[in-house]
Amino acid sequence: MRTSHPNLRRGYTLPHEAEVLQILRDAGVHRARLFGSAARGELTETSDLDFLVQMPGAAPFDEFMQMVDAQHRIEQLTGRSVDMATQLRPGIYAEAEPDMVELPL
């Protein structure tokens, strides 16, 4: 599904997008960026979904538990592995950043 949000780059693929976005909102995510093959519109049957998220205000343990729950729920919904992080090492970020897509939360 592709979104028509005016501030988003076209060409990304996020299976079950509306449901995934609701899971992220329910987990307290305030900002989410999709990166990797899904962000490039190159999703295959075996591709995972990669998210960089921000969850301001949550205590570290609570944030971790909310992320784990959201990750599990998205995996169950999409049938794909999900990688979710609150930060990336500088080298990985530099590689992923050009393809990142801001999701409309």
Predicted segments, located by residue:
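Generic leucine side-chain signal with a strong bias for well-ordered alpha-helical environments
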Residues: L24, L49-L52
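Catalytic core of pol beta-like nucleotidyltransferases
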Residues: M1-R31, R40-G41, P56-L105
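A short, glycine/Asx- and small/polar-enriched loop/turn
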Residues: L43-D48
